[in-house]
Amino acid sequence: MDRVVPAVLAGGAAGAAGRWAIGEFGWSSATNLLVVNTIGCFVLGIVIAALPEREHPIRLALGVGVCGGLTTFSGLAVELAVRLDAGDVGEAVAMGMLSLGLGLVAFLGGRAVPA
């Protein structure tokens, strides 16, 4: 446990730095969000498949730390709320469905990699 906390913190910092770096490509906030969440789901699929022990320190560092720092569910909520507030219900629904669909496909694809 003593080694896990610093590893998760370092992983979280790396993930957050990755999210910031992806944001520097100049894409829209919606595209950035879709990219980071899809990458995070793919990586998490690999991590969970490769390290099935739930409390494995590397799984925690990569899954909770890196993937947790990279992805953002709250960012998705903000993007959807902005669209709903603007009256763009169809766009909000499409974005939500696309995010969930791509996330699931990416996770399943990542989970298949170690096999």
Residue ranges and their predicted role:
Residues 1-115:
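Membrane-interface helix-loop junctions in multi-pass transporters/channels
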